[in-house]
Amino acid sequence: MSLTLKQKLTVARNFAVEIPIEILHFLVVPFALLACDEKSENLPKWAAWFDDPDYGINGDDGWRNEHYPNGKNRTYWARLCWLYRNRIGNFSAKYLGVRVEDIDANTVRTQGDVFATYNKGQKNTFCLVTCKMKDGRERFGYYREIRYGKSKWYCRIYLGWKLMDIVGMRADNKHTYMDENDKKILQTVWAINPVKRIKQ
């Protein structure tokens, strides 16, 4: 399963819009973090584009519990690593993101392995999720993993929008995708990681 020409052009357009902001991100964030104290949850307003819309500067549960436990997630270094890993979240959500409430749930379609994101390189797999917005615009999320033979390495590709979060959405269950803990806006994504290690 490969992307259509229209989908490839959409990825290229999003890339062209976001890459200058991504470059700026690497320059601004180290200085913006200097304006934060240990109790801060977000970057200063003047640097809001570079913040993470869901978890701010201190990371999600995995970041806080596995990577930087016991409050270490609030150090300058942990925050810098988090924001370098999760770049331009507010910009992406505000200007290019998919508002979950605006998705026409009757148009959500899934091709491939709906559990592809849980695969972690165990086998070759993919999932393509497509939908239409209420205004008729089409959106897609393409996730793929390619294992390198019998090695312990694989390639992970995620393009379009982070629509793996709406796999299984229908008109009769859309409300379950809009709970308090669910993401309200799904960001754009163009991530290709050619060297991921399989964890046994």
Roles of regions detected by a PLM:
Residues L5-E38:
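A hydrophobic membrane-anchoring feature enriched in long, contiguous, low-charge segments
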